[in-house]
Curated annotation (Swiss-Prot):
The gene is aroC. This is Chorismate synthase. GO terms for cellular component: cytosol. Belongs to the chorismate synthase family. Pfam families: Chorismate_synt (PF01264). GO terms for molecular function: chorismate synthase activity; FMN binding. It comes from Methylorubrum extorquens (strain CM4 / NCIMB 13688).
Length: 366
């Protein structure tokens, strides 16, 4: 299997399967001299790890990260552990696998999953928990994202769940402080209360539901990205689309821009006090012509309902026989919830990569 690496200068390769011994990543291209401790990475992993509420999978994984390489400390570093510029290997052990839950479906194709397509492509697949196609892989991305944040300390990246099923938040109630106060990463306290009742009913039905996630990067300087094939928004879209269960991505106003007139959609400018242009709106989501404008970079993506549900569904097995299938095991009733820290990580990795690419071509030119 190829295509397990993304990025150009800040490169991340992830490895591991849902029920394997461990998973992790190798981060190559991280500049030397950055302070990096396991605790920095663990803080991000703890936000994503499973089993923290009844609204996520009850698989209990501590997700303890180990830094295997790429850092060093001695008396000359003042006791600080610093990156060396060499590949940073990060490992997270799997400790709570229940592979027996999947023994009954080893030869069956679960509707909505990658079972059939993996078989069609490779002729062999790890059916335990979805193997490489499991959202468990995203733990490695979150670990890499924690390293990426060290490369872009002046940029603040935050994400939130802004819709669950048909229920969108009231943007007038948006409060970033609320994101850490409820199990949904929701910025609207009233919507979070609704989601609790709504998702409880979904769980009792043995079903699942989708969500919309919004991620915002503030402090992004103008100039990141490149025309045509190196567009910042193209790389962000690819990064978000690579997250499990994501079926649509939009930048700024996205698809809503199609309903606007030109005079409504254009981000008008006036002169700022610092001599730089000041934008009067941000319909473009902080990116124009594939290059950051200095406005907040805004990305949203849609996550489909978790495919593993207790409702019987029609399918076939490897022999072509028609079957009715119920997926057992421990699953997220809304996989979009834990996609929030993953979205932040992918934004961080892309912005770190483009920061290094910009620096490589233009030096430190602001």
């Amino acid at each position: 299997m190829s295509h397990n690496t993304f990025g150009h200068l800040f490169r991340v390769t992830t490895f591991g399967e849902s029920h394997g011994v461990a998973l992790g990543c190798v981060v190559d291209g991280c500049p030397p001299g950055l302070a990096l401790e396991a605790e920095d990475i663990q803080a991000e992993l703890d936000r994503r790890k499973p089993g923290q509420s009844r609204f996520t999978t009850q698989r209990r994984e501590p997700d303890q990260v180990k830094i295997l390489s790429g850092v060093f400390s001695d008396d000359r570093t003042g006791g600080r552990q610093l990156t060396t510029g060499t590949p940073i290997a990060l490992m997270i052990e799997n400790t709570d696998q229940r592979s027996k839950d999947y023994s009954e479906i080893r030869d069956s194709y679960r509707p909505g999953h990658a079972d059939f397509t993996y078989d069609a492509k490779y002729g062999i697949r790890d059916y335990r928990g979805g193997g490489r196609s499991s959202a468990r892989e995203t733990a490695a991305r979150v670990a890499a994202g924690a390293v990426a944040r060290k490369v872009i300390p002046g940029i603040t990246i935050r994400a939130a769940l802004v819709q669950m099923g048909p229920h969108a938040i009231d943007r007038a109630n948006w409060d970033w402080e609320q994101v850490g106060q409820n199990p949904f990463f929701c910025p609207d306290a009233k919507a979070a209360a609704l989601y609790e009742t709504y998702l409880d009913a979904i769980r009792k039905d043995g079903s699942s539901v989708g969500a919309v996630i919004e991620v915002v990067a503030e402090g992004v300087p103008p100039g990141l990205g490149a025309p045509i094939y190196g567009k910042l928004d193209a790389d962000l879209a690819a990064a978000m689309m690579s997250i499990n269960a994501v079926k649509g991505v939009e930048i700024g106003d996205g698809f809503a821009a199609a309903a606007l007139r030109g005079e409504d959609n254009a981000d008008e400018m006036r002169a700022g006090n610092d001599g730089r242009p000041r934008f009067l709106a941000n319909h473009a989501g902080g990116i124009l012509g594939g290059i950051s404008s200095g406005e907040p970079v805004v990305v949203r993506f849609a996550v489909k309902p978790t495919s593993s549900i207790l409702t019987p569904r029609q399918s076939v097995n490897r022999d072509g026989a028609e079957i009715d299938l119920i997926t057992k095991g421990r699953h997220d009733p809304c996989v979009g919830i834990r996609a929030v820290p993953v979205a932040e990580a992918m934004m961080a990795c892309v912005l770190a990569d483009h920061t290094l690419r910009h620096r490589g071509q233009n030096g430190e030119r602001p």
